[in-house]
Amino acid sequence: MEAAADRPAETRSRVEKDSRRAKKDSPAKTQSPAQDTSIMLRSNADTGKVLALPEHKKKRKGYLPAESVKILRDWMYKHRFRAYPSEAEKRMLSKKTNLSLSQISNWFINARRRILPDMLQRRGNDPTVGHKTGKDAHATHLQSTDASVPAKSGPRGSDNVQSLPLRSSPKGQMSGEKIPEPGSAPSQKLTMIAQPKKKVKVSNITSSSSPEPVSTEEYADFSSFQLLVDAAVQRAAELELEKNQESNP
């Protein structure tokens, strides 16, 4: 009887132990598929982020197509002295580059600050050709500005001819007038004493505050000049006689 009573107790204890074990094992078994699926979802999400990262960077940087940028750079180089397009030119560039007007405006705003200074120092029609030196670029800029300004020329008056200094006149020049020295005071007078086949003496008659007279030596042939002076004096005397005869018949 006692052995029969012990057997149900042992079976009960075994059943309880098995049930406890089943309870302990069942959560682990049920959680393992959920954990596996969560890990897979996380890994898929991470790979999706990695794959989507380059596209996101491209969108954020806003790179334009290389062909469109080349068209815009060529236009800027041709109009580098007026490097911002008008509305009509923007529409024309938009058709060529397949870009919007806002993209073209933003590109020119940035390019005028970053690309244009280097572009102004380039040489030739191709902006990729080598740089100029600073003096060459400055000389080219001056030539372009001088070409747009018309040259001013006109006949010089007799005053400008008379104001030339004596040392710059040619040897064969003949003049009986007094030639003022450039830069001299108004009170100074320049007199010239001419003799045939002799030295030319130039003396300044100045005021007390002016410097001492300066003499310059210049060899010249004034024989023909002397003949003209004599002829002019003779002609003047003849005219004076004719006037006197007419006044006193």
From Swiss-Prot:
Residues 202-215 have a biased composition (Low complexity). Belongs to the TALE/TGIF homeobox family. Keywords: DNA-binding, Homeobox, Nucleus, Transcription, Transcription regulation. Its main location: nucleus. It comes from Miopithecus talapoin. Residues 1-60, 121-215 are annotated as: Disordered. Residues 55-118 bind DNA. It comes from the Eukaryota. GO terms for molecular function: DNA binding. PANTHER family: HOMEOBOX PROTEIN TRANSCRIPTION FACTORS. GO terms for cellular component: nucleus. The keyword Transcription applies. The gene is TGIF2LX. Residues 1-27 have a biased composition (Basic and acidic residues). Residues 28-46, 159-172 have a biased composition (Polar residues). This is Homeobox protein TGIF2LX. It is found in: Nucleus. CDD domains: homeodomain. May have a transcription role in testis.
